[in-house]
Amino acid sequence: MKFSKTLLLALVAGALAKGEDEICRVEKNSGKEICYPKVFVPTEEWQVVWPDQVIPAGLHVRMDYENGVKEAKINDPNEEVEGVAVAVGEEVPEGEVVIEDLTEENGDEGISANEKVQRAIEKAIKEKRIKEGHKPNPNIPESDHQTFSDAVAALRDYKVNGQAAMLPIALSQLEELSHEIDFGIALSDVDPLNALLQILEDAKVDVESKIMAARTIGASLRNNPHALDKVINSKVDLVKSLLDDLAQSSKEKADKLSSSLVYALSAVLKTPETVTRFVDLHGGDTLRQLYETGSDDVKGRVSTLIEDVLATPDLHNDFSSITGAVKKRSANWWEDELKEWSGVFQRSLPSKLSSKVKSKVYTSLAAIRRNFRESVDVSEEFLEWLDHPKKAAAEIGDDLVKLIKQDRGELWGNAKARKYDARDEL
């Protein structure tokens, strides 16, 4: 049985008419008492939801993730959702639309608090550069929205007041929720992103919290071009921040944190703009230093980043179209960088690495060779390692031995032309 919208409104309003569940509060500026239902009463238009109101199930809810202000209305399944994310971007000054301060704006004494919040949100949306093309997911549970709002509030409390007691719980929640595209877009706003970066740089914050902050950044941006665009168009120099944090974690031998930071950096280096910044900051040198001194897991993470970023022809072609300081310094930077990495990987494969990491390193090296053949100068030491299959099999496992066998002639030349041809079983 389907209820009409009119009947639904009548039922909700009738239930509240008894006045049993009403919330009253005093406005800070005017001292006037205002009252509203404990359970939000929806209409067909967007209305602001007070922080302590209960939102009935089945409504269409949207939220300004920077300050936690929510709006809701009756969900119309036939309605076309506008192609914008409601999350507020980076241009509104901090604190301008915080809900607690909205009742204190000058010249607004005759306007209700609800209307003030509406005006503030409308003003914020007009002043934002909101990314077109993303339709907010209406199927995200309200409980997730509430959890996210509370976690972002904990970030804000840390950034503004230095309160870190709730960070571990908040970061754990954000790490889990940041895989959702809508929440990833929200976390790419300047304030939450800067709070996460501040956590990474704060010597007083424990390593586990820093790891969760790095993973949250990475998950927010991975496969989320809308979020990445917001970061690129903001004033946050995320590439520099992550490279600086990586250099520091390398000095401190904090390998688990380094691995998480590499994960975050790999999510950022997906556009010509971010790769250009990586070049400007000599990011390859930072990663090579990390690779040489880091744990097996760090080496695996770095090799995967190189495969996903530098060994990708499409991104290389986009980068090649960029002119300016980067190209003036080195017209062949990309190829030179790949030569450096192919040498690093060839030298490390015969060394004592776990079979899992050797598989990642070899896969990255093979991708470079396959897509940028001239960027790999094959070394004798590496070929000797390839030409001792029994030794290689003991080090890398049967699966990678099979892969090398498939690649041998195509990527590394004819093994029978070498002195180990009689022993070549690959």
Swiss-Prot record:
Chain's gene name: SIL1
Question: Can you say where in the cell this protein is located?
Answer: Endoplasmic reticulum lumen
InterPro entries cross-referenced by the UniProt entry: ARM-like (IPR011989), ARM-type_fold (IPR016024), Hsp70_NEF-Inhibitors (IPR050693), Sil1_fungi (IPR031884)
Entry's induction text: By the unfolded protein response (UPR).
Give the quaternary structure.
Interacts with KAR2.
Its source organism is Yarrowia lipolytica (strain CLIB 122 / E 150) (Yeast)
Share an example GO biological-process annotation for this protein: protein transport
User: Record's Gene3D superfamilies?
Assistant: Leucine-rich Repeat Variant
Family according to the record: Belongs to the SIL1 family.
Q: What does this protein do?
A: Required for protein translocation and folding in the endoplasmic reticulum (ER). Probably functions as a nucleotide exchange factor for the ER lumenal chaperone KAR2. It is not required for viability but is essential for optimal growth at elevated temperatures.
Q: Which UniProt keywords apply?
A: Endoplasmic reticulum, Protein transport, Signal, Translocation, Transport
Entry's PANTHER family? Answer: NUCLEOTIDE EXCHANGE FACTOR SIL1, PROTEIN FOLDING REGULATOR
Signal peptide bounds:
1-17
Which taxonomic lineage does the organism of this UniProt entry have? Eukaryota, Fungi, Dikarya, Ascomycota, Saccharomycotina
Put simply, this protein is called Nucleotide exchange factor SIL1
| Keyword Endoplasmic reticulum part of the UniProt annotation | yes
GO terms assigned for molecular function: adenyl-nucleotide exchange factor activity
